[in-house]
């Protein structure tokens, strides 16, 4: 029994491992370029079967805990390996030994508590390494990165356990584009640990406390170009004179991101910034100012000099006691050299006139996403305010009047670029006043319904996209770029009103087509973006867009954004791929051709009818059909005559003087029906013929040259033939009065030809001795 249980357990383990391996393989997908993706696939290990074809492997967000020496052994061409957010706690020493081509390695947010330099020694091509978020306390016992001579981006540290930076940690690294250190809980920093790196383009430093900030600053000031401080509480920061006497600082940009600061500590920070002689740009993102703007300091503290700072950026600044905030007048003197200021989404509603006047060098001012209205803007743009200002951005504020906004800015003599997008203007007056040097105006997303002469004619660039415009008819002689996407325009603007236009972006409007003539009318146009419209793919439009090879150079969004909206059977297809049928593209020519063909057919039919007596046949058929449609007076036939005699009027003498005498004077006499004698006067002749034939037992045809020339004889012959067909009897008797060659019989007498081929006929003898026999045979035929 125990043996059986043991076998069952072994089989269960084998099956479980088999299923796990199968699941691992199913969770990994690779394309033909060797890019393999297996993120978030619940993998418990690195899939087996990986070969040298794999160039990129993403196994992030799985449950991998262990990497063995054999897992990646065959991946000799692997260039990128992403193992972030797994549960990796162990990596064998030679796990990466075959990855000499690896350039990107991400081991962040795992459970690696000890780092080994043996992992990284084979990675001679590595340019990116991320070790963030692992619970190690230090960066190993020996230098981890000394062999990574090509490393450009390095990210190390964690929020909780990384407490110590040692001098050996970054030994061997001479140049880095980016170095990110999460030293949120840093407690020990060995002097000159970061000084070994000769040049770092961008250093990102996470520090909760500022205790070791000055020491680190001393080491990096001569090697870092951009220093970024994150998640730091500087409320109690105090600057102390540095013992180094550094004068060759390389720092050009200092960024504070998610930093807490007070009125007093801000002054201390500015003292620190005074040590950076080459500082050009200062940035505060998502910071909190726990103060009221009381920056008044003692005489001993007046050592602040903004130096060469040209750019100041403040985004999403939070001031809890905003309602108590001061007027910043103590800082006015520090702003005279600043050229670029951005204060975005920080609840700014006013720039005091005095501050505006102190900003003498300011060329660029961005006050986007604030609370500015026309009345306060007028105070900000007072006389002598912003004398050098060229670009003013007031995007997404509370401006409501274009006329007032333009008048307010008249004091800014050098202003050339104005962005007042995402304000709610709704309407536009007929005329406005603007600074006379205006070149650029952005009115996108302002809910305007029309454009008027309020737009300055000096503009070179105009953006009115994402509004409710259905017409653009402004004369802007100097305009070079027009952005008018996401409106309701149904056609391109008039080119004669925009003679200098180089760029036109008019996508996502209501345009259905445009022609070569329209585009050619824009003589200077270099770039057109017209995708996203509902194009009617007519033959003319398709021919123009598909045959003009140079069009692709002008249409920057061609062909992906040019889709047909109609005809319905090509809706959604790219314009360049649509092909219409000949009938759709040449309808006029096709109809004309069909009309010509129909005319020729009618003409040919007429000629054939004339040549082969078609009209005569039609008349005869019509008469027959009319006669057949008439109701019969009695269900049974009333035979009144022994024979109806069909003959030509020119053969009347033979019929009346010979035939009638022989048959009607015979005993018993035969009763014959002759048209001259027995037709009812006033009755339609066709009806007389039909009635006489139907009331006669037989029909006698007196054939001669005269007979075949008679139209009425032809009728009588045809009606007799129809009767023969309808009643299936032998009612026709042919008398050949004179010899007739069948070739001489006209084609329209096809019935006569057929009867002569199938029936025996009586021939009138020229010898009088034989005539008695002729009459005997005729009488016998009539009686039969």
Swiss-Prot record:
Keywords: Cytoplasmic vesicle, Disulfide bond, Glycoprotein, Immunity, Inflammatory response, Innate immunity, Isopeptide bond, Leucine-rich repeat, Membrane, NAD, Receptor, Repeat, Signal, Transmembrane, Transmembrane helix, Ubl conjugation
Cross-link (Glycyl lysine isopeptide (Lys-Gly) (interchain with G-Cter in ubiquitin)): 754
Residue stretches making up the LRRCT domain: 525-579
Membrane topology: Single-pass type I membrane protein
GO molecular function: amyloid-beta binding; identical protein binding; lipopolysaccharide binding; NAD+ nucleosidase activity, cyclic ADP-ribose generating; pattern recognition receptor activity; peptidoglycan binding; protein-containing complex binding; Toll-like receptor binding
Self-association state and partner proteins as the record states: Interacts with LY96, TLR1 and TLR6 (via extracellular domain). TLR2 seems to exist in heterodimers with either TLR1 or TLR6 before stimulation by the ligand. The heterodimers form bigger oligomers in response to their corresponding ligands as well as further heterotypic associations with other receptors such as CD14 and/or CD36. Binds MYD88 (via TIR domain). Interacts with TICAM1. Interacts with CNPY3. Interacts with ATG16L1. Interacts with PPP1R11. Interacts with TICAM2. Interacts with TIRAP.
Domain of life: Eukaryota
Free-text domain note: Ester-bound lipid substrates are bound through a crevice formed between the LRR 11 and LRR 12.
UniProt site (Interaction with bacterial lipopeptide): 349
Segments on the Cytoplasmic side according to the record's topology features: 609-784
Signal peptide as annotated in the record: 1-20
Protein name, entry field: Toll-like receptor 2
Cysteines engaged in disulfide bonds, as pairs: 30-36, 353-382, 432-454
Spans through the membrane: 588-608
Subcellular location: Membrane; Cytoplasmic vesicle, Phagosome membrane; Membrane raft
Extent of the LRR repeats: 54-77, 78-101, 102-125, 126-150, 151-175, 176-199, 200-223, 224-250, 251-278, 279-308, 309-337, 338-361, 362-388, 389-414, 415-437, 438-457, 458-478, 479-500, 501-524
Biological process, per Gene Ontology: cellular response to diacyl bacterial lipopeptide; cellular response to lipoteichoic acid; cellular response to triacyl bacterial lipopeptide; cellular response to type II interferon; defense response to Gram-positive bacterium; defense response to virus; detection of diacyl bacterial lipopeptide; detection of triacyl bacterial lipopeptide
TIR domain mapped to chain residues: 639-782
PTM description: Ubiquitinated at Lys-754 by PPP1R11, leading to its degradation. Deubiquitinated by USP2. Glycosylation of Asn-442 is critical for secretion of the N-terminal ectodomain of TLR2.
CC per GO annotation: cell surface; cytosol; Golgi apparatus; membrane raft; nucleoplasm; phagocytic vesicle membrane; Toll-like receptor 1-Toll-like receptor 2 protein complex; Toll-like receptor 2-Toll-like receptor 6 protein complex
PANTHER family in alphabetical order: TOLL-LIKE RECEPTOR, TOLL-LIKE RECEPTOR 2
């Amino acid at each position: 029994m125990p043996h059986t249980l043991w076998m069952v357990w072994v089989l269960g383990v084998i099956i479980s491992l088999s299923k796990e391996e199968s699941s691992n393989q199913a969770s990994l997908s690779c394309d033909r370029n060797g890019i393999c993706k297996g993120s978030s696939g619940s993998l418990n290990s690195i899939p087996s079967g990986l070969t040298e074809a794999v160039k990129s492997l993403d196994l992030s967000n799985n449950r991998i805990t262990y990497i063995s020496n054999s897992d990646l052994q065959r991946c000799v061409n692997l260039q990128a390996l992403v193992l972030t957010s797994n549960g990796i706690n162990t990596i064998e020493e030679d796990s990466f030994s075959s990855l000499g081509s690896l350039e990107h390695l991400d081991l962040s947010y795992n459970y690696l508590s000890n780092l080994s330099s043996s992992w990284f020694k084979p990675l001679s091509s590595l340019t990116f390494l991320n070790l963030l978020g692992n619970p190690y306390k230090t960066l190993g016992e020996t230098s981890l990165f000394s062999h990574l001579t090509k490393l450009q981006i390095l990210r190390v540290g964690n929020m909780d356990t990384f407490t110590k930076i040692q001098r050996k940690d970054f030994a061997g690294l001479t140049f880095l584009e980016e170095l990110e250190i999460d030293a949120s809980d840093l407690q020990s920093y060995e002097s000159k640990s970061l000084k070994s790196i000769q040049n770092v383009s961008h250093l990102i430093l996470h520090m909760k406390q500022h205790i070791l900030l000055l020491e680190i600053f001393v080491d990096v000031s001569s090697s870092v170009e951009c220093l970024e401080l994150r998640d730091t509480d500087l409320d109690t920061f105090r600057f102390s004179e540095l013992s180094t006497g550094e004068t060759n600082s390389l720092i050009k940009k200092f960024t504070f991101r998610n930093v807490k600061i007070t009125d007093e500590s801000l002054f201390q920070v500015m003292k620190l910034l005074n040590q950076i002689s080459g500082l050009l740009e200062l940035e505060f993102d998502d910071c909190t100012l726990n103060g009221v703007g009381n920056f008044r300091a003692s005489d001993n503290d007046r050592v602040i000099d903004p130096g060469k700072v040209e750019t100041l950026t403040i985004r999403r600044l939070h001031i809890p006691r905003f309602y108590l905030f001061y007027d910043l007048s103590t800082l006015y003197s520090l702003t005279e050299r600043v050229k670029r200021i951005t204060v975005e989404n920080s609840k700014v509603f006013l720039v005091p006139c005095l501050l505006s006047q102190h900003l003498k060098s300011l060329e660029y001012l961005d006050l986007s996403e604030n609370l500015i209205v026309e009345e306060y803007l007028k105070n900000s743009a007072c006389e002598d305010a912003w004398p050098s200002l060229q670009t003013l951005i007031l995007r997404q504020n509370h401006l409501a009047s274009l006329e007032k906004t333009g008048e307010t800015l008249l004091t800014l003599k050098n202003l050339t670029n104005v962005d007042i997008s995402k304000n709610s203007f709704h309407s536009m007056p007929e005329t406005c006043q603007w600074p006379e040097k205006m070149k650029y105006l952005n009115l996108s997303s302002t809910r305007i319904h029309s454009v008027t002469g309020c737009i300055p004619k000096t503009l070179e660039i105009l953006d009115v996209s994402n509004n409710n415009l259905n017409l653009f008819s402004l004369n802007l002689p100097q305009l070079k770029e027009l952005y008018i996407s996401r409106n309701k325009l149904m056609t391109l603007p008039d080119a004669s009103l925009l003679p200098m236009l180089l760029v036109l972006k008019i996508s996502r409007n209501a345009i259905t087509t445009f022609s070569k003539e329209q585009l050619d009318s824009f003589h200077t146009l270099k770039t057109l973006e017209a995708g996203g419209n509902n194009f009617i793919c007519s033959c003319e439009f398709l021919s123009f867009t598909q045959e003009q090879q140079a069009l692709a150079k002008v249409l920057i969004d061609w062909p992906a954004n040019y889709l047909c909206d109609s005809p319905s059977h090509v809706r959604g297809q790219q314009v360049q791929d649509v092909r219409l049928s000949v009938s759709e593209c040449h309808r006029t020519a096709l109809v004309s051709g069909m009309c010509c063909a129909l005319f020729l057919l009618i003409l040919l039919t007429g000629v054939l009818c004339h040549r082969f007596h078609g009209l005569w046949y039609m008349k005869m058929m019509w008469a027959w059909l009319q006669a057949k449609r008439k109701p019969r007076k009695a269900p049974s036939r009333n035979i009144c005559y022994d024979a109806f005699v069909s003959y030509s009027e020119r053969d009347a003498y033979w019929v009346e003087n010979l035939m009638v005498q022989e048959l009607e004077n015979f005993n018993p006499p035969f009763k014959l029906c002759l048209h001259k004698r027995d037709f009812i006067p006033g009755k339609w002749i066709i009806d007389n013929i039909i009635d006489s034939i139907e009331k006669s037992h037989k029909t006698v045809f007196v054939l001669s040259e005269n007979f075949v020339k008679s139209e009425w004889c032809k009728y009588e012959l045809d009606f007799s033939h129809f009767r023969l067909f309808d009643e299936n009897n032998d009612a026709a008797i042919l008398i050949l009065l004179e010899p007739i060659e069948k070739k001489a019989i006209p084609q329209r007498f096809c019935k006569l030809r057929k009867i002569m081929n199938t029936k025996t006929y009586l021939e009138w003898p020229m010898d009088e001795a034989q005539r008695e026999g002729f009459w005997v045979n005729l009488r016998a035929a009539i009686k039969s």
